[in-house]
Amino acid sequence: YHAARFEQLYQGEGSGHPIDDLQSLIRNELPFETYMELAEWYESVGCTEEALSLLSCAGNYPIALYKQAYLLHQAGNDDESRGMLQRAGALSPAMVFPFRPSSLKALEWAKTVQPDWKIDYYEALIRWANQDKAKALELLENCGEADYAPFYLSRASLKEGESRLADLLKAEQIEMSWRTGFALINHYVANNQWQKAVETGKKYTKKYPSNYYIGLKYAKALCETGQYQPCISLLSRMQVLPNEGSYAGRAVYREANLYRAMEQLSHKNYKQVVKSVETSKEWPENLGVGKPYDNMIDNRLEDYLEAKAAAGQGDSRKTSALLAAVADYTISRSHFESGNLLSALALRESGHVP
């Protein structure tokens, strides 16, 4: 237990290098958070020296430096406190994600001594992490201009409409990271601005060709703008990492092929309809999701379209068989599905109902 080891070392038991001995066994991904957690307890019981000793182990973690500055100020050591504030203010906010409400007092004090947009940003992240989104947005709005793209991405997440878009575009001006591109595409998709989504997707897919988060959104935008073959081609080159619930790639793949089949059906190109329908039934391995058991797949739309193509080709036997498959699909769910309408149409077209 790190707290027990710290007590032993702080009391003089060990090798004579207490800080080195303590740090030697703290090997987690975010060691500074361990020191922050321990220091918080010592501060809460009035053991300022112990808290400062632990915070010093956190290195150049800005929140730890602000905490040290605050505790030094409380102890009357204002010269060293100002030095800590200057160190903290000079550091980048990259990968700094504070969440402890106990850090708020130090940050609020720091703003009165050395105002800096980063302090408001850190405080906003803490407020946000503790479900006070309104206060978080208020703090972010008061920050003024910042030269840090994630600041604008964060603020955009708390906004809506044109105000949100303005922050996303500002983030893009500062840094065209994949996260900026992903946020922009998501904004356009959410607002049904499909052509903008296509333009943004094309730009960022070119810059980040192996990023399937962007690629899937771009593919969806291509599908929604009627560019079915480019969508299918893009999906064929994509490698989606398999993960639980990763159905998006296969869903767009199916949609693009079925929309293409419907387009060809309107032109009476029946052979291509059948080809597109058969392709839509595939479960490409590169799209990150495995094929379920056959009895778990609802192919009514595929079969219905293929029945229409067979009817156009004059193949009455195949038409009847496909319509029967649609009509006989076992409906086990209590709620109505759009596929149920196809079953009803198939029954009527088969002559089973008037």
Regions found by a protein language model. Name each.
Residues 60, 89-90, 144-145, 173, ...:
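Amphipathic alpha-helical segments of tetratricopeptide repeats
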Residues 15-16, 48, 78, 100-103, ...:
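TPR-repeat structural position
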Residues 7-8, 41, 71, 126, ...:
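Residue-level signature for tetratricopeptide repeat
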Residues 12-13, 45, 75, 130, ...:
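Structural motif corresponding to the intra-repeat A-B loop/turn of tetratricopeptide repeats
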Residues 29-30, 59, 63, 93, ...:
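Short coil turns that delineate tetratricopeptide repeat
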Residues 1-3, 34, 64, 98, ...:
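TPR alpha-solenoid repeat register
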Residues 22-28, 95, 107-113, 170, ...:
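Flexible helix-coil transition and linker loops at the boundaries of alpha-helical arrays
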Residues 2-7, 37, 67, 122, ...:
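"A position-specific structural signal for the A-helix of alpha-solenoid helical repeats
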